[in-house]
Curated annotation (Swiss-Prot):
<dbReference type="InterPro" id="IPR013503">
    <property type="entry name" value="Circadian_KaiC_bact"/>
</dbReference>
<comment type="subunit">
    <text>Homohexamer; hexamerization is dependent on ATP-binding. The KaiABC complex composition changes during the circadian cycle to control KaiC phosphorylation. Complexes KaiC(6), KaiA(2-4):KaiC(6), KaiB(6):KaiC(6) and KaiC(6):KaiB(6):KaiA(12) are among the most important forms, many form cooperatively. KaiC interacts with SasA, activating its autokinase function and leading to RpaA activation.</text>
</comment>
<dbReference type="Pfam" id="PF06745">
    <property type="entry name" value="ATPase"/>
</dbReference>
<comment type="function">
    <text>Central component of the KaiABC oscillator complex, which constitutes the main circadian regulator in cyanobacteria. Complex composition changes during the circadian cycle to control KaiC phosphorylation. KaiA stimulates KaiC autophosphorylation, while KaiB sequesters KaiA, leading to KaiC autodephosphorylation. Clock output pathways impact the RpaA transcriptional regulator. KaiC enhances the autophosphorylation activity of SasA, which then transfers its phosphate group to RpaA to activate it. KaiB and KaiC together enhance the phospho-RpaA dephosphatase activity of CikA.</text>
</comment>
<dbReference type="InterPro" id="IPR014774">
    <property type="entry name" value="KaiC-like_dom"/>
</dbReference>
<feature type="binding site">
    <location>
        <position position="45"/>
    </location>
    <ligand>
        <name>ATP 1</name>
    </ligand>
</feature>
<feature type="binding site">
    <location>
        <position position="222"/>
    </location>
    <ligand>
        <name>ATP 1</name>
    </ligand>
</feature>
<feature type="binding site">
    <location>
        <position position="49"/>
    </location>
    <ligand>
        <name>ATP 1</name>
    </ligand>
</feature>
<keyword id="KW-0547">Nucleotide-binding</keyword>
<feature type="binding site">
    <location>
        <position position="292"/>
    </location>
    <ligand>
        <name>ATP 2</name>
    </ligand>
</feature>
<dbReference type="GO" id="GO:0006355">
    <property type="term" value="P:regulation of DNA-templated transcription"/>
</dbReference>
<feature type="binding site">
    <location>
        <position position="290"/>
    </location>
    <ligand>
        <name>ATP 2</name>
    </ligand>
</feature>
<dbReference type="GO" id="GO:0007623">
    <property type="term" value="P:circadian rhythm"/>
</dbReference>
<comment type="similarity">
    <text>Belongs to the KaiC family.</text>
</comment>
<feature type="binding site">
    <location>
        <position position="47"/>
    </location>
    <ligand>
        <name>ATP 1</name>
    </ligand>
</feature>
<dbReference type="GO" id="GO:0106310">
    <property type="term" value="F:protein serine kinase activity"/>
</dbReference>
<feature type="binding site">
    <location>
        <position position="287"/>
    </location>
    <ligand>
        <name>ATP 2</name>
    </ligand>
</feature>
Amino acid sequence: MQFPPASGSTQMQVQKLPTGIEGFDDVCQGGLPIGRSTLISGTSGTGKTVFSLHFLHNGIKHFDEPGIFVTFEESPLDILRNAASFGWNLQEMVEQDKLFILDASPDPDGQDVAGSFDLSGLIERINYAIRKYKAKRVAIDSITAVFQQYDAVFVVRREIFRLIARLKEIGVTTVMTTERIDEYGPIARYGVEEFVSDNVVILRNVLEGERRRRTVEILKLRGTTHMKGEFPFTMGTHGISIFPLGAMRLTQRSSNVRVSSGVPRLDEMCGGGFFKDSIILATGATGTGKTLLVSKFIEDACRNKERAILFAYEESRAQLLRNGTSWGIDFEQMEQDGLLKIICAYPESTGLEDHLQIIKTDIGQFKPSRMAIDSLSALARGVSHNAFRQFVIGVTGYAKQEEIAGFFTNTSEEFMGSHSITDSHISTITDTILMLQYVEIRGEMARALNVFKMRGSWHDKGIREFVITGNGPQIKDSFSNFERIISGVPHRVTTDERSELSRIARGVSSED
């Protein structure tokens, strides 16, 4: 038996058509297979129609590929109006003969259809439109409506299969939508739609905690590879945006340039400041001074004529301006100079994927050299651990990709003593961790600061007193006379104990 030459295998590989949908081509590793059909399945409101329209719109706008939209549900006028909400001028594309909307919606009078079911007429209309407009892409919305109009499921299945076979014969790339009942139940309502399609994509809109979370999953991509699992997505003002975190690569450059924290003593503790492209986390109980450190970080950027952006999820803009004034920081002047942008929003105002999209959009437009989020813990309220972890990875990955220094805060639940920073999924992602906490010394409450971690650099290991004054933060000497500060039960070291420790240290040194 003879095998074809190795070069023939390349020719036989499935070619892919880019959809142009942000993130989706990363998930399917290049796009949808050319000349094949893809089933877009989801419950009501998951974005199936938007996906199919986005597929056609991008084909026309970015790849000069005319498209045909076959509607079995909405009228062409409703489709044009709904698309306009995403900034898509489909009417202009229709007038330019780049897009044709074929209306196959049911008779509004609800008249019964007599005789046997046959799609021959519709198939010929689609075939004619494809030839006339030289279409490369076809979207059918939705085949569920066809099943609902006729009782003979096996006959409808046969006709749908005949339609898809004809489209495949013509060579167009087709997406068609179908409705399912449950988010994690059968793929399609009638249980046959997925068998007549080459590829299956599932859209979900699941209630997690108190919020809805949209995800996309490629269940089947026949003859080619794709990323596995669910990936979050959002529907914004420009359509669908998918966040394929699995496609992120650790290929960003690493800078040796340092930037100041805005607090000279803290810079000394960090070996000369933070790295330019590092992610810094300040974690501690409420009131320990996390927002103050963020403010000084932002102020230092603006003082050096660099742009900075602050995303605040716990305080209003007025509160931030007032608090900044009490520390001698004029945020309002920085805004007027065009060096600072402040975005304030309630975490519950939208989903995490939407917050991530807003962050990426604002950073892309403002182009800052530093960013800050105050705080991550506020965004974690009411969402699953997995959703929050993906959000943090998305934000930090984007910041590193853009070579932006990021300063985030996290509020710990414990008011006194040590607290875990691993439960928030961010301890291993961040480059520098500043731990702030309350300590009781001689019957008075004091604040302590420690550089808990600093990747790739020497840093001070001491636990130092952190004081907030009208002129900002002051970092004083370490609590050298105390131990067990981190545990929350500081113990004063006596003179005898200090002498003994010094003697032991000298003994170890002499043995070396």
